[in-house]
A protein has these predicted regions:
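Short amphipathic alpha-helix with an adjacent loop that forms part of the alpha/beta core around
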Residues: 16-20, 82-86, 126-129
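Metallo-beta-lactamase
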Residues: 56-110
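Conserved beta-strand hairpin/beta-sheet module of binuclear metal-dependent hydrolase folds
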Residues: 1-19, 102-118, 135
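Active-site neighborhood of phospho(di)ester-bond hydrolases with catalytic His/Asp-centered motifs
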Residues: 2-6, 27-34, 55-58, 114-118, ...
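Cap/insert and terminal regions of metallo-dependent hydrolase folds
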Residues: 125-165
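Active-site glycine- and acidic-residue-rich loops that bind
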Residues: 115-127
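Active-site metal-binding motif and surrounding structural segment of the metallo-beta-lactamase
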Residues: 9-56
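Active-site environment of divalent metal-dependent phosphoester hydrolases
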Residues: 35-39, 61-63, 98-99, 121-124, ...
Length: 165
């Protein structure tokens, strides 16, 4: 299973090969939100990987500008569990400046992996969801001092430092 497809398709496929994962073994792509650094290669990945669908909520699908074939799309409701093969997937809301961004907890064989990307700030609900995770992937995409000293325009710095990241 992949979480997002924001890097180049070439890098994704090379990464699968480098880690010994067959393309046929990838069972889905879980989309966290529609920003280009999370979905850039979604069309090519869903086209090249024969057995997969991409999973997103309705608002995220509506906001994604890069087309994904209808037969490769699956829609879930944030807060409602669903299955991909033997994996129980629990999408939960996160604060970010996107249509309906989510984090995921993935359960299999009494293990929990939780993934939170681009979170503007940690909420009690997020803490409650991830507290028992056996593995937590938490994207920390800026350090305040480096961001403030960097070359981003002021409006972007303000947005990143805001409550929705």
């Amino acid at each position: 299973m992949l979480i997002d497809a924001g890097i180049s398709g070439k890098k994704i496929f090379q990464g699968l090969e480098d880690t010994g994962v067959s393309m046929e073994d990838v069972c889905g792509v879980l989309v966290t939100h529609e920003h280009i650094d999370h979905v850039k290669s979604l069309p090519i990945v869903t086209k090249k990987l024969p057995n997969i669908k991409a999973y997103a909520n309705e608002n995220t699908w509506a906001a994604i500008e890069r087309p994904v074939a209808d037969e490769k799309r699956a829609t879930f409701h944030t807060g409602e569990d669903f299955y991909i093969e033997d994996f129980l997937i629990r999408p939960f809301p996160i604060p970010h400046d996107a249509a309906e961004p989510v984090g995921y907890s993935i359960y299999i064989a009494d293990r929990q992996i939780s993934i939170v990307t681009d979170v503007g700030h940690m909420t009690d609900e997020i803490f409650e969801e991830i507290i028992d995770a056996d593995l937590l992937v938490l994207e920390a995409n800026h350090e305040e001092e480096i961001l403030l000293m960097g070359s981003y325009p002021y409006h972007l710095k303000r947005r990143i430092l805001g409550e929705k990241g």
